[in-house]
């Protein structure tokens, strides 16, 4: 794949372009209110030049956090490899302005040690591979991507602690852990002397499981929160207002089961879209602002298939406030849509 070879110089006004930065829990680290996730759109099925344009635009608008995982693609590993190529080409001079994260927890390579989980062997080896793919000496944040009930939590957290002490990550986090397991993880890491920086759960208007006890837990423990899938795998965009378009995630059965797009579910989405229009926002912009209404949420992770889509999402930051009446009206339609694919991890 090819990419632009012209010299990239970051916009001089990138920190005056409307980005909001929030403190991550009780740490000393700030994150942008909207971060760029590379779960989709950065594999080998997307032209490298398009990926490059998205990364350049994101940084030019003050997005300093890029979130990856070992298995992002397709194929597995390709998002990290492509990011590494573009980082070396465009972003290496700005390394100290960036927060780059990766994760490990799902199947990645053949044999018993690459099938995922939370073993020390898998996590350390996986991060070493990620660093090699991205051409980095360290990541800023490394996550346990899921809770593994077959591995002692002490081993998983011990691996994260040793990764920090080895200089391979500055901070550590967890993803899709329940409230009680999060408290356990915090306690184990605290005893080791390595604080848990951040939790990455799925959270959106149509997937509100974190409100049961996780957000309270994170606040109590001083842990930040970065919400992934805040647009409900695309349901909270204009994409599905009139059905399932060709090429969409639902049409391709990628992370969004088309069976979930029932008449009832779409009626709620259309009602929310009407409220967004009254606010002068797109549905996606209102959905992002809604996730960020709670100051316990440090950042919302968005994906982008184009510069235009990225810009639309970032423009959510111009209108973050809601009236009590607006929130009450939204609650009538912000109902569970059965889209939490990660519930098996957070159910323990």
Question: What role is predicted for each listed range?
Answer:
Residues 3-18, 147-332, 337, 347-348:
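Beta/alpha (TIM)-barrel catalytic core signal, keyed to glycine-rich beta->alpha loops juxtaposed to Asp/Glu
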Residues 57, 61, 133-134, 167, ...:
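Structural motif
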Residues 131-151:
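Active-site groove signature of glycoside hydrolases
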Residues 46-50, 78, 82, 114-122, ...:
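Alpha-helix N-cap and loop-to-helix initiation/capping positions
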Residues 1-98:
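N-terminal binding-site loop/beta-alpha segment at the start of enzyme catalytic domains
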Residues 32-33, 67, 93-98, 137-141, ...:
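Short acidic capping loops at alpha-helix termini that bridge into adjacent secondary structure
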Residues 25-43, 101-115, 138, 143:
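N-terminal small/glycine-rich loop or linker at the start of catalytic domains
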Residues 45-58, 118-134, 182-186:
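Short, acidic/polar
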């Amino acid at each position: 794949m090819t990419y632009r070879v012209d010299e990239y110089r970051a916009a001089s006004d990138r920190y005056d372009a409307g980005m909001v930065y929030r403190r991550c829990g009780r740490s000393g680290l700030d994150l942008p209110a909207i971060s760029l996730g590379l779960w989709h759109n950065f594999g080998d099925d997307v032209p490298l030049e398009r990926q490059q344009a998205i990364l350049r635009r994101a940084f030019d608008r003050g997005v300093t956090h890029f979130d990856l995982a070992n298995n992002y693609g397709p194929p597995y590993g390709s998002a990290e490899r492509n990011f590494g190529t573009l980082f070396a080409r465009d972003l290496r001079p700005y390394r100290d302005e960036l927060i780059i994260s990766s994760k490990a927890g799902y199947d990645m390579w053949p044999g018993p040690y690459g099938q995922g989980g939370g073993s020390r062997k898998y996590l350390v080896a996986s991060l070493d591979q990620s660093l090699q793919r991205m051409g980095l000496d360290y990541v800023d944040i490394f996550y346990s991507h899921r809770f593994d009930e077959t591995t002692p939590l002490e081993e998983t957290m011990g691996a994260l602690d040793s990764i920090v002490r080895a200089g391979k990550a500055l901070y550590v986090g967890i993803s899709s852990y329940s409230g009680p397991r999060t408290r356990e993880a915090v306690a184990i890491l605290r005893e080791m002397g390595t604080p848990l920086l951040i939790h990455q759960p799925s959270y959106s208007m149509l997937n509100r499981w974190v409100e049961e006890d996780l957000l309270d837990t994170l606040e109590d423990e001083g842990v930040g929160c970065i919400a992934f899938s805040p647009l409900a795998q695309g349901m909270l965009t204009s994409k599905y207002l009139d059905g399932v378009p060709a090429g969409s995630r639902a049409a391709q059965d990628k992370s969004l089961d088309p069976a979930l797009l029932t008449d009832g579910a779409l009626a709620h989405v259309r009602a929310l879209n009407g409220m967004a229009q009254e606010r002068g926002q797109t549905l996606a912009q209102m959905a992002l602002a809604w996730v960020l209404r709670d100051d316990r949420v440090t950042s919302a992770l968005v994906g982008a298939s184009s510069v235009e889509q990225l810009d639309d999402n970032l423009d959510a930051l111009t209108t973050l406030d809601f009236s009590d009446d607006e929130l009450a009206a939204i609650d009538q339609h912000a109902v569970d849509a059965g889209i939490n694919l990660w519930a098996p991890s957070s159910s323990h």
